[in-house]
Amino acid sequence: MLIHEDNRYIVEKEYNLVTEPQNASLFTTGNGYMGVRGSLEEFGSTRIQGSFIRGFVDEIIEVIEPFCDNEYMKKYYFDEEKLKKFDKQISCINLVDFLLIRFRIGDEIFYPWEGEILSWERRLDTSQSIFQRSVTWKDKMGNITVFEFERFASYDEEHRYCMRAMAKPQNHFLPVEIISGIDTDVRTGGQRVLQFINNQILNNGLISCFQSGKRYGITCKIAVKNSFFMDGKLQHSIGEQQENLLLNKALMPGGGREYCVEKTIYLTTDRDCDPLFDTIDTVLLDVGTYDAYKEAHIREWSQFFSNFDIKILGDDRKDAQLRFATYHAVITGDRNNSIHSLSAKGLTGERYNQFVWWDCEIYQLPIFIHAFPEVAKHALIYRYDRLEEARENAKLEGCKGARYPFVSSLEGKEHVWIYARHPFLQVHITADIGFGIINYFINTLDYEFMELYGFEMLYEICRYWVSKVILKDGTYQLLGVTGTDEHHPYVDNDAYTNYIVQYVLQETILLDSQYSSTKVRDKIGITVNELKDIEQVSRLLYLPLEKSGLIPQFDGYFDLSRDLEVDGSGTGKNFQMKQAGLYHKSQVIKQPDVMLLFSYLNFEIKNSRYEENWDYYEKMCESSSSLTFPVHAICSADANRMLSFLNYFNETVNIDLLDIHHCAWQGVHAGCLSGAWYAIFRGLMGIVTRIDCIQINPKLIPFWQGVELSFIYQTKKIKATLNGNVFTLGSEDKKEISVYFQGKRYAFVDRLEVSF
């Protein structure tokens, strides 16, 4: 079990083979461009080792052998004809293992499963984004050596990864050999995918050039510079190849106090549009030192992370857990380009294939929109770069405009697993992207982005919905869809889908009237009549709402049983189902649908009853998706149920630390972890940003002394502080902003304090 120290460290105190796969995910180091799992330097075990570059993907064989053991799986979940045809899938590709560092002490190579471990500690320093390990090891002959390892993915130079490893003899004078290099024998999905072009081996450096696979053939180059030291003096080294290992080695005599290797790795691909790809061999001549690179990295990381860091006062454990969650949320974001976007596992594992889902715009984008908008902008430009393929998707469906795939990768066509029925019905993804664009603009007023990218996407998204809806009983309806709750496919008028579509249509018309230019309209030929059609559909789209104020998740939802009939052996548990349930007969849902409207989307729904809906749907949700927990935390805060808020917040920050869903080894739950930040911002502090004001509704939380965070609203950086029943906003920017609190408007310039 991992522990917390000094509000910044996540620490492992013993070597445990059982938790090694899970902790490899948790100890990932990354910088948005690359992610490197926390595997051991001396040996990268299969399914534990993993190094990834954002957008470095190709095709793999994916073996899957599910079977249907109840009516629900047979008729509603699997398409068994397509299951027979499925064998290939796009996936992120595991790079060569460049972490390889081994120490030979006398005749014994250090491995933690050999000899005796006298002490062991691995720690992730979230304040510096550095991963460290310290081991005291006794070999079979009783020789004791202390090993210290340190590594980080540079925030100063995103293509650089730095490592340092040291051996310190304690009771012997044995010679020490350090072996540092690259292990090319790696697998993705259990198979060898990389296509090697060439390798170069020098006395103090290595270069490996390979391609992602046979479909895309993305070329990657990795250069490694090794410098070996004995008591601070540079040592001679040689280069050699041993089967799959590309190595630099230095054999040093006994009697030294400290033996060290400093290892600098540069990674680049031909998709990066970076001159490093053509000049990578020159990095072996680099005279930069590990300490200099470390100092520059810490400086850049500290500045970057300070935008996101929330301080919880009076609860050090929760403060550390939140900082860990925020760390993983933000290392998924690329600050420099839009080659790829925010994926569900970030760059911490192979599972979910580095695909981009609706999680991106709804769960992951808010932390960046409010704290570092440039990353959010890159994520949305990623969507724009796939607009043409989204147009083709709409045509294939017989619709106009653009339909975005439920799952995307390098391409904008659908990449979801073909044997599952529901993803092809989850058309809400197209509205989710529209919502993300609008949310970004509300908080940034980035007119240039809208002119170059945003409006064109919004117009095409609206065109899709206008052609998608069906006129029935005097209203426009959306039939045969799946909402966010994947347990219920083939439903009519899903609440989440209809409400978010209506919002995107309505807001697009509003933004068009206030901000759009004829240049964008002319580019895609949007006409006045089309704008009228968009307005009409937004006005007449059916929005589910009962007279009681309850919102049915879809047509006929309340007619289903509130119990879940169980039938079968439970093969569905591998597909995020807690039981072998006949979900099509039950109101039991996988994750929030209706409650997203009130929490993440912040819709003010006339005549609805928020608390009654929350009371109902909380009980119907089996929480088999991690995305449940931050939503439920916010809803609990809105209902002034602060103990419930704390419990759901605990599940949000601990989803992977405590391995709540028993799959942390596959990679962290980036959407849920991003929700930890948003649960404080939106839930506890009650901050909702509108285009013309900030609304606040802070909550008294008796378990903590206070909370502090910073956010950006329309270029104004604001510090928010919650201390008991006093809430304060402060800013050095003199721009005036309207703030609404308890029905009263305040003019906020540099400081605003309210009591509640």
From Swiss-Prot:
It is an enzyme of class 2 (transferase). Substrate binds at residues 358-359, 590-591. Optimum pH is 6.5. InterPro entries: 6-hairpin_glycosidase_sf, 6hp_glycosidase-like_sf, Gal_mutarotase_sf_dom, Glyco_hydro_65_M, Glyco_hydro_65_N, Glyco_hydro_65_N_sf, Malt_Pase/Glycosyl_Hdrlase. GO terms for cellular component: cytoplasm. Its EC number is 2.4.1.282. GO terms for molecular function: carbohydrate binding; glycosyltransferase activity; hydrolase activity, hydrolyzing O-glycosyl compounds. It is found in: Cytoplasm. GO terms for biological process: carbohydrate metabolic process. Pfam families: Glyco_hydro_65m (PF03632), Glyco_hydro_65N (PF03636). It comes from the Bacteria. Phosphorylase showing strict alpha-1,3-regioselectivity and producing 3-O-alpha-D-glucopyranosyl-L-rhamnopyranose. Specific for L-rhamnose as acceptor and beta-D-glucose 1-phosphate as donor. Does not phosphorylate alpha,alpha-trehalose, kojibiose, nigerose, or maltose. Monomer. Belongs to the glycosyl hydrolase 65 family. This is 3-O-alpha-D-glucosyl-L-rhamnose phosphorylase.
